[in-house]
Amino acid sequence: MSEPIRVLVTGAAGQIAYSLLYSIGNGSVFGKDQPIILVLLDITPMMGVLDGVLMELQDCALPLLQDVIATDKEEVAFKDLDVAVLVGSMPRREGMERKDLLKANVKIFKSQGAALEKYAKKSVKVIVVGNPANTNCLTASKSAPSIPKENFSCLTRLDHNRAKSQIALKLGVTADDVKNVIIWGNHSSTQYPDVNHAKVKLQGKEVGVYEALKDDSWLKGEFITTVQQRGAAVIKARKLSSAMSAAKAISDHIRDIWFGTPEGEFVSMGVISDGNSYGVPDDLLYSFPVVIKNKTWKFVEGLPINDFSREKMDLTAKELTEEKETAFEFLSSA
């Protein structure tokens, strides 16, 4: 057996964490021979609920879970971490301006970034899920200057999986038969789901999605809006935000960081834009297609970008730039 790794999940009393923790504990994220010390952080008023989650994890009797620690203290939660999954954030309440939401979250992620800087290993991998995920991730990274920027990523895998599944449903294949969809930009309704480079397996052959579907107007219209607005559609139907699908996407995202991406396949994640070849401004946390090897991601280079894509990519970059500027005003005064 390997040495145990320390994995933190914040917002651990919430419903995404409730769907995620079992996957982490049972070996389907870090592998079946990787023991885990699982650290659960939430705010003080949630500690009663968190105790219940702790009891359930104990009752799962998972062989890989060496220890489970529930806490409301950052100095306990962030100590010696190998992986931090930052799920907890201030949710958007009715009538709340996006600016107010940003302000509340800058405070949280500045504090958690500082705790990573002070207590975690410098090799820690940080995955931000709490919304607005891209800007929260950038805030945390800026607050932890001695941890490499490349170690921070945010979740756009849920959007990626949504795009995959919409194509699969339309073609009557399984989601596994669709690969190399891309989510560009922000995890918001300006994100751009791009299937210009995606492939689908039909009758044993790989075919481009545009060629397979022969329905450009759907691909440039309804497909994009369906993926962009899927989160809102789930909330409308279920009266709660996506949890099972979000937890599955987090598991996919972390597993790919840990074990690498399959040959010939790329995935989407929000990463620092420095040095990209797609004309996205530096110093943004932007979702790109990446390949991963030895726990290190690289941009997929050289994909041709048409005018339709360019416009959509620029639009979401503009939104991220505005978010960043607002967040940084708060950051300097926080």
UniProtKB/Swiss-Prot annotation:
Gene Ontology molecular function: any one: L-malate dehydrogenase (NAD+) activity
Post-translational modification note: ISGylated.
InterPro entries: L-lactate/malate_DH, Lactate/malate_DH_C, Lactate/malate_DH_N, Lactate_DH/Glyco_Ohase_4_C, Malate_DH_AS, Malate_DH_NAD-dep_euk, Malate_DH_type2, NAD(P)-bd_dom_sf
Main subcellular localisation: cytoplasm
Protein localization: Cytoplasm, Cytosol
GO cellular component: cytoplasm; cytosol
Gene: Mdh1
Residues with PTM Omega-N-methylarginine: 230
Modified residues (Phosphoserine): 217, 241, 309, 332-333
PROSITE patterns: MDH
N-acetylserine: residues bearing it: 2
Pfam family, one: Ldh_1_C
Family: Belongs to the LDH/MDH superfamily. MDH type 2 family.
Modified residues (N6-succinyllysine): 110, 214, 298, 318
Sites of N6-acetyllysine modification: 118, 121, 298
Active site feature: 187
This protein's name: Malate dehydrogenase, cytoplasmic
Sequence positions that bind substrate: 92, 98, 131, 162
Keyword DNA damage included in the entry's annotation: no
Assembly and oligomerization: Homodimer.
GO BP, one annotated term: malate-aspartate shuttle
Function statement: Catalyzes the reduction of aromatic alpha-keto acids in the presence of NADH. Plays essential roles in the malate-aspartate shuttle and the tricarboxylic acid cycle, important in mitochondrial NADH supply for oxidative phosphorylation. Catalyzes the reduction of 2-oxoglutarate to 2-hydroxyglutarate, leading to elevated reactive oxygen species (ROS).
Database matches in NCBIfam families: MalateDH-SF1, MDH_euk_cyt, PRK05442.1
